[in-house]
């Protein structure tokens, strides 16, 4: 499965913010249900941290839901 790029303007994005940005969850509180019901992988390793910092180059995968790669958006000069 090809990872969908997620562009950020900050040094990192937290896992719950990433899933809200991608409309996987509507509120930050829903991350608990995702972590309880699905295996969430960050760079191939299982993640159970709601607010795990995800950096450019990191790949987040949720089986049956999708896969996303964080990309640093270049600042316009």
Which sequence ranges carry the predicted segments?
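Small beta-barrel nucleic-acid-binding modules, principally OB-folds
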Residues: 4, 17-18, 74
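A basic, amphipathic helix-loop patch mediating RNA/tRNA/ribosome contacts
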Residues: 14-56
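A generic "binding-loop/recognition-motif" signal
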Residues: 11, 38, 66
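A detector for short, charged/polar N-terminal pre-domain segments
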Residues: 1-13
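Low-complexity, intrinsically disordered short peptide segments enriched in small/polar/basic residues
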Residues: 3-5, 37, 59-62
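C-terminal structural segments of small proteins and small subunits
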Residues: 49-77
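Intrinsically disordered, low-complexity regions
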Residues: 4, 29, 45, 65-67
């Amino acid at each position: 499965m090809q990872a969908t790029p997620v562009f950020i303007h900050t040094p990192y994005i937290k896992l719950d913010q990433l899933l809200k940005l991608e409309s996987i969850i509507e509120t930050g509180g829903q991350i608990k249900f995702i972590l309880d019901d699905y295996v969430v992988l960050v760079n191939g390793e299982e993640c159970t941290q709601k607010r795990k910092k995800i950096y450019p180059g990191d790949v987040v995968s949720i089986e049956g839901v999708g896969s996303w790669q964080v990309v640093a958006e270049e600042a316009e000069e």
